[in-house]
C-alpha cells in the first residue's frame, strides 16, 4: 500500500509559456491543486495496481452559466490495471485489462465524468519484447449545466437547438513499437 500526497501551484497564464519552463517561482498563481491517492500494488504472475484518488483545487474558476466564480472544486478517480493472462510459453507476454473512472465538480467543469476501459498485450510478437498492442474505449460525459447553457443561448437567439450529444466517445486500436531498448 502507498499513500501519495502532493501540492501544485495553479498558474494558467504560464502554462505553455516556454520561457517559464524552468522557473520554480510561480508568477501568476491562482491557487493550489492537492491530489491525494491511495495505491494498492501487487507483483507476481498476474500483477495488479489499483489507485483511488481525490483532488482539491483552491483556485477560482468561472461557474458554468453564470458570471460568478466558484472556488474549492474537487473530484475523484479510480484506476485499475490488472494482468489477466500470462503466457507460459513466452516470458513477458502478458495481457492486462484496465479501467478508469473520474468525476469532477459540475460547477465549473465542461465534462463531469470520464470512463475508460481496455486491454493491452505486452510482447505481441516474439521478436518484439517491448512492443504493445492495445484496444481501448473512452467516454467523456458532458456536464448537464453546459448543455443547459448552450440550449438556453440558442433559445434566446431564436436559433435551433444545437445538436448536442450526451458524451464524446472514442475507440482506439494502437500498436506501440519500441525501436530501441531504453
PLM feature spans:
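Residues on the lipid-exposed face of transmembrane beta-strands in outer-membrane beta-barrel proteins
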Residues: 36-40, 78-82, 117-123, 173-177
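Outer-membrane beta-barrel transmembrane domain signature
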Residues: 110, 127-181
